[in-house]
């Protein structure tokens, strides 16, 4: 389940007043995912995806949201962040960072064919080319430093799990 933060209709209606997307007609949680809360949002103006960020902090998100906008502006078929009335891509909902992006058409391809792989490869190449003109840089938050910390945590959890399992044996 990936709806960690429940949003009531009146809360979402109030939040959407800060966007030029029309009036709310429907919304429902997206059950897939592992880290953020996501909702499909339908308004009188179109379909969107609301993301409530559960782990990343507000100061960490502008890089990603601006990069998504950059890619979309360069013809990459990716969600386009929707700016609020203050021309910001990031807002707050339920005291957490939140953003609204365009909803893409399509479905998940669970068994890709070689043709799918070719199309993904071409799209990835175009994405890299479009990304070259993005003016900002950021260290990979899941790079070498994170891997060391994660490995230590996994080792510690494995040790505790082994100890717990042996005490119940």
Where does each model-flagged region fall?
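Active-site catalytic-loop/activation-segment of kinase and kinase-like phosphoryl-transfer enzymes
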Residues: 1-4, 141-163
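Juxta-kinase regulatory segment immediately upstream of eukaryotic protein kinase catalytic domains
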Residues: 1-25
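Short acidic/polar alpha-helix capping motifs at helix-coil junctions
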Residues: 1-3, 29-34, 52
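ATP-binding glycine-rich phosphate-binding loop
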Residues: 19-42
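Proline- and acidic/polar-enriched loop/turn elements at helix boundaries
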Residues: 28-29, 83-84, 139
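Single conserved hydrophobic/aromatic residue that forms the stacking wall/gate
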Residues: 164-169
């Amino acid at each position: 389940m990936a709806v960690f933060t429940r949003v009531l209709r009146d809360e979402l209606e109030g939040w959407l007043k800060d966007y030029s997307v029309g009036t709310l007609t429907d919304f429902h949680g997206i059950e897939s995912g592992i880290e953020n809360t996501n909702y499909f949002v339908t308004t009188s103006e179109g379909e969107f995806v609301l993301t409530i960020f559960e782990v990343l902090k507000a100061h960490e998100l502008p890089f990603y949201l601006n990069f998504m906008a950059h890619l979309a502006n360069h013809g990459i078929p990716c969600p386009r962040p929707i700016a609020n009335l203050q021309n910001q891509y990031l807002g707050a909902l339920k005291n957490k960072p939140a953003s609204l992006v365009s909803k893409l058409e399509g479905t998940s391809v669970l068994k890709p064919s070689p043709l799918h792989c070719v199309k993904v490869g071409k799209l990835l190449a175009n994405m890299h080319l479009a990304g070259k003109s993005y003016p900002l840089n950021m260290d990979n938050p899941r790079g070498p430093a994170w891997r060391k910390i994660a490995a230590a945590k996994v080792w510690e959890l494995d040790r505790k799990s082994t100890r717990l399992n042996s005490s119940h044996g």
